[in-house]
Structure formats: structure tokens, C-alpha cells
Amino acid sequence: QITVEDMAAYSGVSPRTLTRQFADQLGVPPARWLLERRLAATRALLEETDLPVETIATRIGLSSAVNLRRRFNTALRTTPGAYRRSFR
């Protein structure tokens, strides 16, 4: 699981500096950007595979299926299961 701290260490700056520069350049904080990438990967996996939500959560770097469901529902206003069914 990639964190803001990992990104900052890789970039050779503090997490605070990374957050500021990241938001200045991309318009969103790095944590939000990471979550958006994870949710995009989740959507692709739900559309293209039959992997269980638990496996998808692990694969995209979230701690649990519960965490994935909560974040998915907050962002997309639907559950991962309902989203997958809409592509079947």
C-alpha cells in the first residue's frame, strides 16, 4: 500500500511539502489522488473480473473489504456489488 509518506520519501521531500506541491500542481492532495486511482482500479476489476471484493481491496492497497465498500459507496453512491451487477 502506497502512502503519502512513501511518496514524500521517494521524492526526497517532507510529507507536508509533497502535499502542498502536489495540490498546487494537480489541484488535489496526494491522499485524494491515491484514493481516486484506487477507486478507478476497483471499477476496472469489478467490470472485468469476478474477483471477490476482499481480494480487490487487498490488490488495490486498502486494508479491508469494509474499508473499500465504505469508500466506494461514499465516492460513487453505490456498492461494489451493485456496480458489478450493472455490467453483467
Please annotate each region the language model reported.
Residues 1:
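Short glycine/proline-centered loop/turn elements that form peptide/ligand docking sites
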Residues 66-88:
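…primarily DNA-binding HTH/wHTH and HhH modules…
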